[in-house]
Amino acid sequence: YLYLMDINILQISNSDCSVMQQSVNIGHEEVHMSYIEFQNVKKIYKMGDVKIKALNGADFSIEKGEFAVIAGASGAGKSTILNLMGGMDTATTGKIIVDKENVSKFSAKKLTTYRRYDIGFVFQFYNLVQNLTVRENVELATQICKNPLDIDEVIEAVGLKDRSSNFPSQLSGGEQQRVAIARALAKNPKLLLCDEPTGALDYNTGKQILKLLQDTCRKRGVTVVVITHNLALTAMGDKVIKVKNGIVDSVTVNENPLPVEQIEW
């Protein structure tokens, strides 16, 4: 139920457009602290006497304003990382730092606040309220946040200005996903977390959605994390984190990420 509730309060951040680095002072030394840090994070699920290690000591970092791609096969641990990062689940051990705060130590109440104000989710399925118009779906999300963006500006930004009075059943799959992204964007949190956001879309529509996400990162300075099984999409990431069997197999910084228009798969 928590998962379904949080799907309906999707958001994005309109944070500072520059990629900012954070640091903390220890004695006379300044030590760099990334915007997001996973430090030896483990997530173990118990099913009777059986323990399933969904994550087994994940370590990586993401800077503010980066477009990060987390890639791996089904069952590798990608969605677990996203759920932990977004406060949808809690780590068994290890630290999860977001914007200098240890999310892994948050109380249930603080996790709820964190999800509402700081995190935006975009999923493979759109989870729109069917009897509300495009504008009403976006407006619904703004009612539970502190500093929402202008609804009409956000709808225009995702290319749905002329569809704002339509209901979800009157929209294509790509248009419905744009509404989900607009709903996220309108809430104005810190992070946009995308779990296979093009999985239910055809090739061309999927490219349009990825371009919208990439533009959101580049033009608004939003930190965007996309998880995918499609390794071709790693070319568009500033940072590529490959996950295999519950561990981080590799982390690559891409000095020249490609626009999604130049990527084929």
Report residues per predicted region.
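Short hydrophobic targeting helices and cationic amphipathic motifs
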Residues: 2-4
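Cationic, low-complexity basic patches in intrinsically disordered or flexible, solvent-exposed regions
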Residues: 22-23
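Short, intrinsically disordered, charge-balanced linker/junction segments flanking boundaries
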Residues: 30-32
